[in-house]
Amino acid sequence: AFLLIPAYLGLNTTASANRVFPKAEWYGSIWDQIKQLFYLTKPIKNQQFDGGLNIYCGTICFVLLFVYLLNRRIKLWDKVKNVIILVVIFASFNNQLLNYIWHGFHDQYGIPNRFSFLFIFLLLAMCCEVLMKLQKKDILSVMLGIACGYAFLILATKKCTLEKETLLWTEIFITAYAVCMVGFTLTKGMWKRIISYVLLIVCLVETTINGIKGYDSNGYVDISQY
């Protein structure tokens, strides 16, 4: 009480004490945020618009997420709860009230949606889980997942404003991941290990180049600017 009461009284003298809950309104189109999942999209360094976010975590997720949903050996309840959490977090990126709650009942400033790492972590965890469980008998779910990944890309091109370079490289990477995952699913032993290394190399190349491009677009690569 000796610590909490002075802290409470002190907070009541700040500007935050006079704020009220924002309305449950949307910042804009959800497709503008889905766009940030794509390769070579410009990351946010500092932005006054509260609806921006950084959620890029690899093109492979476009395929593995659907493979995860179609895989029968992953429990239905696990799929449902993980998808619900993903949807709630993603909706929170675009909703003023939910965003306010995620930021500890506080308005965000400068770097919006700082809790996006939770979305990235869960998405990658789901993708990793299904990748580790793939077996030869899962080839149908893998092929359907790949088809869904391409369908998602086609839909995104109609809803999002994607640059030609982003679209081209996304198609290339999805195709590369599709080939690797089919091979990974159908093979065993040494060949499966080799394909897993190829898959790892493709992922590293993609994310490394995207990271370099991201730093370059924000002006942190040129030493003369320090």
Annotate each language-model stretch with its function.
Residues 1-81, 88-89, 95-105, 112-117, ...:
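Periplasmic/ER-lumenal interhelical loops and adjacent helix-loop junctions
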Residues 83-100, 106-226:
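Contiguous transmembrane helix-bundle modules in multi-pass membrane proteins
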